[in-house]
């Protein structure tokens, strides 16, 4: 966050992609992006990742340790990829809460899961990751996939996730990160800033939203920084696993 102020009473600013915007405006701008892309979000995920996002999510689920009877919170759950899989794992005695701050994404997720007949043990909640509306010590596992980079105050969100977890509960953060290979990093930059907006224009008629998404990835904390943020929030045994040469990483932490 950029804490520079133009005057004694100026509002703090934060980044929206590569832009500096007042903190109060970021959530609105992010909401506009996801209202725009919600209907074709799944299609664009497949196109832009070549289907790899499904493998990344599968590995995250394996790391979660979720089992029958667990209560799981999937933040920024969007169209319900993770929630559908957790629903099967927790079974009829468990519960999955799919939370998203964006009502358009939440509607797409609800409709998609209802159509697939997998929403029996899933609750849909519109919620802000920074101020989760759930009791303390409530969930066995909390996940957030490709959502943390869009949160204004990431540290506050991580603390909120810690609060709602039971002692011994697990947080998993799946997010784009910093490539570990210089050649891969250069290729990924070219891909992100040329192909992603072009694909957005051709498929959704919205290049700007995908330009923002590319920029937001670059502004997100790298692997070690995010690990430190989780430790500072109070998580124990924080580890991360790089996937696809660090383009994506999944972090896991345990509530003491």
Swiss-Prot record:
EC number of this enzyme: 2.1.1.163, 2.1.1.201
Basic and acidic residues compositional bias, start-end: 1-12
Pathway connected to this protein: Quinol/quinone metabolism; menaquinone biosynthesis; menaquinol from 1,4-dihydroxy-2-naphthoate: step 2/2; Cofactor biosynthesis; ubiquinone biosynthesis
KW Methyltransferase (keyword) present: yes
Binding site for S-adenosyl-L-methionine: 79, 100, 128-129
Swiss-Prot/TrEMBL catalytic activity: a 2-demethylmenaquinol + S-adenosyl-L-methionine = a menaquinol + S-adenosyl-L-homocysteine + H(+); a 2-methoxy-6-(all-trans-polyprenyl)benzene-1,4-diol + S-adenosyl-L-methionine = a 5-methoxy-2-methyl-3-(all-trans-polyprenyl)benzene-1,4-diol + S-adenosyl-L-homocysteine + H(+)
Top EC class of this enzyme: transferase
InterPro entries to which the protein is assigned, alphabetical: SAM-dependent_MTases_sf, UbiE/COQ5_MeTrFase, UbiE/COQ5_MeTrFase_CS
CDD domains referenced in this protein's UniProt entry, alphabetically: AdoMet_MTases
Region (Disordered): 1-23
Keyword terms: Menaquinone biosynthesis, Methyltransferase, S-adenosyl-L-methionine, Transferase, Ubiquinone biosynthesis
GO-annotated molecular function: 2-methoxy-6-polyprenyl-1,4-benzoquinol methyltransferase activity; demethylmenaquinone methyltransferase activity
Listed GO biological process terms: aerobic respiration; menaquinone biosynthetic process; methylation
Known role: Methyltransferase required for the conversion of demethylmenaquinol (DMKH2) to menaquinol (MKH2) and the conversion of 2-polyprenyl-6-methoxy-1,4-benzoquinol (DDMQH2) to 2-polyprenyl-3-methyl-6-methoxy-1,4-benzoquinol (DMQH2).
Family: Belongs to the class I-like SAM-binding methyltransferase superfamily. MenG/UbiE family.
Protein name (Swiss-Prot/TrEMBL): Ubiquinone/menaquinone biosynthesis C-methyltransferase UbiE
Organism, as annotated: Pseudomonas putida (strain ATCC 47054 / DSM 6125 / CFBP 8728 / NCIMB 11950 / KT2440)
